[in-house]
Amino acid sequence: MSGLLSRLFPQRPKATAEQARQLQQQGAILLDVREDTEWRAGHAPGARHIPLRRLPARMKDLPPRRTVITVCRSGHRSAQAAALLAREGRDVVNLSGGMNAWARAGLPVVAGGGGPGRVA
């Protein structure tokens, strides 16, 4: 049974907020898959924004051969995005706990206009 479960729900690498920030600083793409209103309220500096529902059509917008760190508010939508990207052969890591964990770690959150943001 565990073999079937691992094939149905393969584990994706996960990162803490601090690890994700370090990967981003080393050149990984931090991909925020939340909706537009969530993004505008607050996101990680330097993140790219492609809502989960648009990701299948926009995967080509992501540079190949770069690690992608997926993030949403809590980690669930980003896990779906990570699975989708992994099926396409991308090197992908899911930010465990999402933007909630990012903010709890004291990492910066900026609003759509560039000022201080909040996780929505």
Listing of model-derived features with the role each one plays in the protein:
Residues R73-H76:
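Residue-level detector of alpha-helix initiation sites
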